[in-house]
Each structure stands twice: as structure tokens, then as C-alpha cells.
């Protein structure tokens, strides 16, 4: 049995299938962990949802910002953008089934036996793993309830940008969603920045600090696997592994086998515009 990890697919299913074949992934005995953003800029978002859903218990996914945006668009809260290439999902005969399945997926997942956990964007510096699980679960319960439209309608916005245990209601949920699906940089005081998408090496970053480089209030006892940040080009250190290597932007898709740290790479065509 092997455990495979992959970053943002964004509808680039052919690239994922190529990597899984190269790695000799076997659904009946292996696990595939996907760090969110299954859909959006690539050509096969519909087919990607069908494939991952079909893997059933062999696949673990966490929701990304594009996945949440798809749910909002499908429910008429936002209008579809041509560049997101999700119309095929909205028009599909199994659209309702796929969207219901997507809505039931978590924002955060921790492997039960291996020392890693996954969220799409990362974990804010104020939280430990137990808190992350708790706060993510609060949002998941709401998203999976009959009141999910209220959450989808009110999740957009960049504030609050700093965690407080006193946050309640939609402000609490919005911080959690932003931290787990949109965060890249923080300010030195721990406030989230929702705008900058640059590489940390770019001089225009200024005082901003990658979320994983800020001093943490509590040490995380698992390595954090995340996607979302293509400009990192697959950053890895003893604490984190970033697996978005920019497939949709014409760079590559990376599949990591946890047990021996083997990496499988596939050069990709540009799909984002």
C-alpha cells in the first residue's frame, strides 16, 4: 500500500492520470490525497469530479477556493466566469449528484496513521492541529447542513483578517475559510493577507511573510501538505510540503509518494488566462 499526494488539479485530468499511471497507483490498495481545487481553469473539470468521486474511499480531498466558488456559482450566488470552465459541470446530467458529493468534503484532513495533515492553503499561525480540526469542522457542519446557502452567500470577503476566540457566526466561518483555502502571506503580527500571490522572493512582497514562516503559537506535530500557491514552485522544508507546481499555468503537476518521498512530474500546457 502506498500513499500519494497531489496539489491543485484544476480540471487537468489527463495530467493526473498520466502521473498515476507512472506511479502505478492502484485504487484497491493505495490512497490518493488531493489538496483541493479539483476544478476551474483546466479543460476537464467535470471529468475530474467524476474520476475522484469514483475513487470512493481510496481518495481523500480537502476543499479549495475554486471548489467553494463552484458550489456558490451552481447555486446562483455568483455568475460563472468563462475562464473557470465549469459550465460543463453545471449542465451535466449528474451535476446535482457531483455537487452534493463535493459539498460533503472537508476543509482539513489529518492522516490517521501517517504524520501529515492537509489543507488547501495552509494553517494560520494562531492554530494548532486540534484547533484547525475543530474550526474546520464548524464550517463543514454548516456547509453540509440545510443552511449551506447562507454560508455560500456570506463567505466572500477578506475580513476578519485576525483570529480571535471571540469571533462568532459568519465572521468566524469566513476567517476559517480564508485561512484554509485562500491564505498565502501573513503580516508579521499574524494578520492574513488575501491579495498577494507573488513568490516570497519577489521584492514587491514587502513586509509580508509566508504563513509557514511566521512563529507559531504552538508547534504542529505533523507535516502540513498544501496546494494553492503556484508561485512557490513546490516549496518543501521540515514542516511543510507545497504541492501546487503550477500545472494550469503551463509549469508542471507533481505527484508525491509519501513512503519514499518519490516525486513524479508531468510538464503541462497553459490553461489559465
Swiss-Prot record:
Pfam families given in the database record: Metallophos
Enzyme type, top EC level: hydrolase
Record Gene3D superfamilies: 3.60.21.10
GO MF annotations in UniProt: bis(5'-nucleosyl)-tetraphosphatase (symmetrical) activity
Catalytic activity: P(1),P(4)-bis(5'-adenosyl) tetraphosphate + H2O = 2 ADP + 2 H(+)
E.C. number(s) listed in UniProt: 3.6.1.41
Keywords: Hydrolase
Domain of life per record: Bacteria
Function: Hydrolyzes diadenosine 5',5'''-P1,P4-tetraphosphate to yield ADP.
HAMAP family: ApaH (MF_00199)
Family: Belongs to the Ap4A hydrolase family.
This protein's name: Bis(5'-nucleosyl)-tetraphosphatase, symmetrical
Species of the source: Photobacterium profundum (strain SS9)
Organism classification: Bacteria, Pseudomonadati, Pseudomonadota, Gammaproteobacteria, Vibrionales
